[in-house]
Amino acid sequence: MNAVTESAATTAEMPVPFVFTDAAADKVKQLIDEEGNPDLKLRVFVQGGGCSGFQYGFTFDEEVNEDDTVMNKNGVQLLIDSMSYQYLVGAEIDYKDDLNGAQFVIKNPNASTTCGCGSSFSV
């Protein structure tokens, strides 16, 4: 497990490889509170599929795997597995609630193209 914090205070911690916004962390905290299970963590992953080749996925998980990178923000944990990590380095994980609806959004500088809905991409 790799621990990541917004400000790396010790040499054992890695620099921040992605941004987990306050809006996203606060929404995750709200959803976890609604579930009533404080052991839940948000897992963000990349898998094959979608109209552009890869797609993002979000799920709640109670387990932290050995190869996960863990980011702590506002009292919640974000998990990214080692395969997905390479596609998400430099990305911003945000939560938007506007006229287009409410959803988690990933702004990924590694994506060369994205589909219209923003849930799939290619590199």
From Swiss-Prot:
Binds 1 iron-sulfur cluster per subunit. The gene is erpA. Homodimer. It comes from the Bacteria. Gene3D superfamilies: HesB-like domain. InterPro entries: FeS_biogenesis (IPR000361), FeS_cluster_insertion (IPR016092), FeS_cluster_insertion_CS (IPR017870), FeS_cluster_insertion_RrpA (IPR023063), HesB-like_dom_sf (IPR035903). Its cofactor is iron-sulfur cluster. One of its GO terms (biological process) is iron-sulfur cluster assembly. Required for insertion of 4Fe-4S clusters. Pfam families: Fe-S_biosyn. One of its GO terms (molecular function) is 2 iron, 2 sulfur cluster binding. Iron-sulfur cluster binds at residues 51, 115, 117. This is Putative iron-sulfur cluster insertion protein ErpA. Keywords: Iron, Iron-sulfur, Metal-binding. The keyword Kinase does not apply. It comes from Burkholderia lata (strain ATCC 17760 / DSM 23089 / LMG 22485 / NCIMB 9086 / R18194 / 383).
